[in-house]
């Protein structure tokens, strides 16, 4: 057993024989790039000059009424592409180029990973094909248009629930027959080894930056670090720097959708059971017969019935706790951040903010809370408009 492939009992590489050589080649190339100074230098140059890192850490001025609480936002909404997805899309695309691949395939839910992949492919002159569920295409028309503008081909997926998990299935199918010239640029910290580790590595600068920024501003570490969790890449990116700092509480916030008591949610770690999906062992939403259940969230990027295996491990070990926020709570947090701070957040990030605002009200001691504002909300404006029927009161 490859111990590097596992986080406790979670992770692994449960794939068809056809994909074994592709994953082996990828793991070897990834391990080599970690030691390759030229690769690292080029990647960090692009993060600085093209992506716009480091992203700011912003202290909220008005949204928190409790005088004992300072709420900071890690502003991934301000980087090129509008979300944290660009960090790792660029890392993987650069790796693919180094491997001699000429074609990139990706899956996308909210469209942000598709846009980030299209951006990276345009920059590095790689052919780009993005698989997207028909349900998500309707929800995210502007991101589909962005992908087309950036030169990507968007392939509509109608199978299953026509959402993210089905787009992943189609991408894996394509890769099984095309891996000689194609890299599958998986969008979250899930899937078969080495993807969870690779995606975490290409997102860990979020947590590294927060750590140095908060020490500079406050001369101490935060009490809480909070991030939304769908697949979990933005969360593992910010958590990674604090895993050994036991005094820092790590909180992932899942989509409770219409309520955890309904079957219309995406709270995999709160309501799921352990199983295998998309090549890794992790918590999954399942029905009574063990089939993968459909997830629901107002946010397309959290609408996934699985979660990255390291989050399953962090839950089991108790190092992180996983809470949830409903569609209604996320919408309310979205409105509040717009009106109180002048920042339009992604609906995904609004789930983390919703929980952070509830927590802030309860804090009885001086507390510092950091929320990963994983993306901006331009893509969600029509969803929010329809949900609120155009009214903001």
UniProtKB/Swiss-Prot annotation:
Protein origin, superkingdom: Bacteria
Key words of the record: Amino-acid biosynthesis, Aromatic amino acid biosynthesis, Lyase, Pyridoxal phosphate, Tryptophan biosynthesis
Coiled-coil region(s): none
Enzyme class: lyase
Reported cofactor(s): pyridoxal 5'-phosphate
Modified residues (N6-(pyridoxal phosphate)lysine): 85
SUPFAM superfamilies linked: Tryptophan synthase beta subunit-like PLP-dependent enzymes (SSF53686)
Enzyme Commission number(s): 4.2.1.20
PANTHER family: TRYPTOPHAN SYNTHASE, TRYPTOPHAN SYNTHASE-RELATED
Descriptive protein name: Tryptophan synthase beta chain
Natural source organism: Helicobacter pylori (strain ATCC 700392 / 26695)
